[in-house]
């Protein structure tokens, strides 16, 4: 399944749990604000952002088929942003990618919660 299809699953998951102001990096939704690091020319756009109970949270679909170094940089940035904005970072891991996501955040000390998605 393509990453865009997983992002739509995440949006559906969030709507079912009462999240509001959902922005997603897929067609048909408002695109979340992109961020960049001072040391990097790359612009990182979260897959999904949403708000619940005045907390802004970031949701990132993690696939082991994506470049690891870019994924780690993006997750570190989003983790820092979430902490600064009193929010959380959630890694949405499809079947077969869950252990990869758990190992990655443990190895690179990224503060995030990993959630399984279908």
Q: Where on the chain are the PLM-derived regions?
A:
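Domain-level recognition of nuclease-like catalytic cores that cleave nucleotide substrates
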Residues: 92-118
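Active-site metal-binding core of divalent-cation-utilizing nuclease and nuclease-like domains
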Residues: 1-4, 16, 21-55
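A short, highly charged nucleic-acid-interacting micro-segment common to nuclease
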Residues: 1-12, 90
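A general structural detector for well-ordered alpha-helical segments in enzyme core domains, enriched
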Residues: 10, 74-78, 101-104
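Conserved catalytic cores of phosphodiester-cleaving nucleases, focusing on short active-site segments
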Residues: 46-74, 78
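Structural motif
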Residues: 25-28, 61-65, 92-95
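Arginine/glycine-rich "motif VI" loop of SF2 helicases in the C-terminal RecA-like domain
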Residues: 79-86
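Hydrophobic beta-strand segments of well-ordered beta-sheets in folded domains
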Residues: 55-58, 86-91
């Amino acid at each position: 399944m393509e990453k865009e299809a997983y992002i739509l699953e995440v949006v559906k998951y969030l709507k079912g749990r009462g999240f509001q102001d959902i922005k997603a990096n897929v067609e048909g939704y408002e695109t979340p604000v992109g961020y960049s690091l001072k040391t990097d020319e790359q612009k990182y756009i979260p897959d999904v952002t949403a708000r619940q109970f005045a907390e802004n949270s970031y949701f990132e679909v993690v696939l082991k088929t994506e470049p690891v170094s870019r994924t780690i940089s993006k997750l570190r940035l989003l983790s820092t942003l979430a902490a600064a904005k009193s929010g959380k970072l959630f890694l949405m891991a499809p079947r077969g990618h869950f252990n990869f996501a758990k190992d990655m955040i443990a190895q690179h000390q990224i503060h995030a919660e990993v959630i399984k998605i279908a």
